[in-house]
Amino acid sequence: DCADSDCTGNPACPVGGTAIGGSCELKTSAGTNVKGTYSASRVNYKAGIEFDAGPESMLYASVVTGFKSGGQSNADINPYLPEDVTAYTIGSKNRFFGRMVTLNAELFLMKYKNRQENFSALDRGGAQVSSLFNAGRAEAKGASVDLTIRPTGNDTFRAAVEYTEAKYNDFVYRNYRAGNPTASTACVVNPVVGGSAAVGFWTIDCSGFQLPRTPKWSGTVSYNHTFELANGSKIDFSPDMSFASSRWLSAEIVENARAKAYALFNASLTWRSADDAFSVQAFVRNIGN
């Protein structure tokens, strides 16, 4: 019985609203108040296991659940639902050669239900607003490796790399705008059933696209060498590099909001007093622009 809802978990459309495409559209004017109530609760858990494979090696696995509360969107009267995530990890932490080398590796899988995303849209009164909505199901899976080498007491080399496949499994949202949004997104665009291009109701299907702000490849490389001076003070020379592959910056999947791959180089030179009471640093960020 869906008498009190639209059969998707949203409340029934109130007086003044129009049911279009399984959602409730309400075109409001300035000063119009839309009131309602919302509540949600969850019980989360964390479970894990560790196994010492040797004096300097450990294997571990865990499963963790998380919850982000829902609420009321600015763009329409439909509440956005809570976001639930379940994260699975399995990994290993190791030290070799008298702790000269540290090597950690991890595999991970994160499953999202009703993932919350933020996007810019027009409200029913035609005003530009930032709105939260549910993107449906999504997952992120991948692997990370961290390596630290200390060949001497004055030298430290670190490297970390992560590979992530993160995508929307089910991501269909509705937007209210004037004109066909096909040119502004790489997603599949269709008029909403019951609406028309004239009133600007559209469904946008971004299923299968990469999650925003999640590059496939990312990592860092750094080195530190400490020069010990005759008066007991020290100088640290520390170059580093970070990189990331291309990624979308917003859930709208807009080409002009796609960040290109980059590599960022930095370096610093730090003088420290013999008692480490104070220091002076010179640094360069984004070498090579």
Descriptions of predicted regions:
Residues 43-49, 76, 86-90, 131, ...:
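Hydrophobic, lipid-facing positions within transmembrane beta-strands of outer-membrane proteins
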Residues 52-66, 82-172:
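Membrane-embedded beta-barrel scaffold of Gram-negative outer-membrane proteins
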Residues 109-111, 133-251:
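Gram-negative outer-membrane beta-barrel transporters
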Residues 1-111:
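Structural signature of Gram-negative outer-membrane beta-barrels, strongest in the C-terminal barrel
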Residues 86-89, 102, 209-289:
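Conserved C-terminal beta-signal and adjacent last beta-strands/turns
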Residues 1-38, 72-76, 114-133, 169-207, ...:
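Solvent-exposed loop segments that connect transmembrane elements
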Residues 1, 63-69, 96, 107-113, ...:
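Transmembrane beta-strands of outer-membrane beta-barrel pores
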